[in-house]
Amino acid sequence: MRTKSLKKNRINVVTLGCSKNVYDSEILMGQLKANDKDVVHEEDGNIVVINTCGFIDNAKEQSVNTILEFVEKKQQGDVDKVFVTGCLSERYKPDLQKEIPDVDQYFGTTELPGLLSALEADYKHELIGERLTTTPKNYAYLKIAEGCDRPCSFCAIPLMRGGHKSTPIENLVTEAEKLAANGVKELILIAQDLTYYGLDLYKKRNLAELLENLVKVEGIEWIRLHYAFPTGFPMDVLEVMKREPKVCNYLDIPLQHISDDLLKSMRRGTTHEKTTKLLKEFRKTVPEMAIRTTLIVGYPGETEEHYQELKEWVKEMRFERLGCFTYSHEENTHAYNLEDDVPQEVKQERANEIMEIQSQISWELNQQKIGEVFNVVIDRKEGNYFIGRTEYDSPDVDNEVLIDATTVYLKTGDYYDVKIAEAADFDLYGEPLNVTTEKPKRKELKIKSV
């Protein structure tokens, strides 16, 4: 069926899931632009590409619902073609083809050339690092590796993304230079496992050397690290963080649990004692570091004693940033062979309690910031506030700094010294120092008479 409108050859890329998917969609859109294809936003395209997530049940449900939504639009004649790619398609392609046959074609996570061909575009190998960024202009994700070699019992990522494959340092530097040339000032380094970076290419953990090369890129102000693994963490990274002002005093390191019984069952390769020692070493070496972690509650076999151990440990460690999720029983994982024996309501109660504890910790830590001055980047304006972040905060998941937009003019993407005046549990309220109080007036256009 043909679309009701004349929107021909306009491609809408819909991205679901994590920052790695955002990056992959940006690469796809960069390739499409290089092929002179018209890439558009929601509702404007007659061709739709859905980049799905297949990590946990909620993400899978969202992906399936999105596919069904666009299939219905196709049936109604509002779009011509629907293509599906990403982790859900990689993991469940035969099932999806059977259950939702109205999708024109399904592609896995490594089938970009095939997807481009279906979109009547050529895969251009020479476009190293060139993409169409969808994040605010001041920051961008830099994916330094694909896949994962860890054997974590609960995780299906290796099924969808394959083994760990590091991107060469020179390629990443080239990509960073191109991003900086386009106005990007903050690089958020992402991978399934930053800790492993370089072992496959250089036979050693090479994250520190990568950072030393990236800090030389002109125009980059901040470099942020996301998704490290505790076992085998390269401690020389801390020395670079301490020495190089461009490397944010920030580390996202998912720890999942602290009970030795569960860490063993999860196949995390560490213990309560080793994990605590590692975190204390982080704080000793880089005292200003903000540590973000994520935890899982309700894993098979988690008893009340295991949970209490985790809860007390969270109180002891006082993480600057923390997220807590309920366990999702994923087929084809090692843990799927275990009984999912913690009731869902108990899982949710435990997650809620952990987040209540973290909210109090965050409030207490934020109160200590009142009166201090921080360098803040402005991400956007919402209503009567400019919204920014410190180097201790990543976009979307961490604290934000709110500045009254009725009293001062700030430029999105710029950095300002901001004095903190008030603090809530996850928000800071600040006053910028030494800035103009008015938005610059537009210059009048003077037309000379002839």
UniProtKB/Swiss-Prot annotation:
Cited SUPFAM superfamilies: Radical SAM enzymes
Requisite cofactors: [4Fe-4S] cluster
Domain MTTase N-terminal, residue spans: 9-124
GO cellular component, one term: cytosol
Domain TRAM: 367-434
Gene3D superfamilies hit by this protein: Methylthiotransferase, N-terminal domain (3.40.50.12160), Nucleic acid-binding proteins (2.40.50.140), tm_1862 like domain (3.80.30.20)
Subcellular location: Cytoplasm
Catalysed reactions listed for this entry: L-aspartate(89)-[ribosomal protein uS12]-hydrogen + (sulfur carrier)-SH + AH2 + 2 S-adenosyl-L-methionine = 3-methylsulfanyl-L-aspartate(89)-[ribosomal protein uS12]-hydrogen + (sulfur carrier)-H + 5'-deoxyadenosine + L-methionine + A + S-adenosyl-L-homocysteine + 2 H(+)
The EC number(s) this enzyme carries: 2.8.4.4
Primary localisation category: cytoplasm
GO-annotated biological processes: tRNA modification
Similarity comment: Belongs to the methylthiotransferase family. RimO subfamily.
Functional description taken from the UniProt entry: Catalyzes the methylthiolation of an aspartic acid residue of ribosomal protein uS12.
Record-given protein name: Ribosomal protein uS12 methylthiotransferase RimO
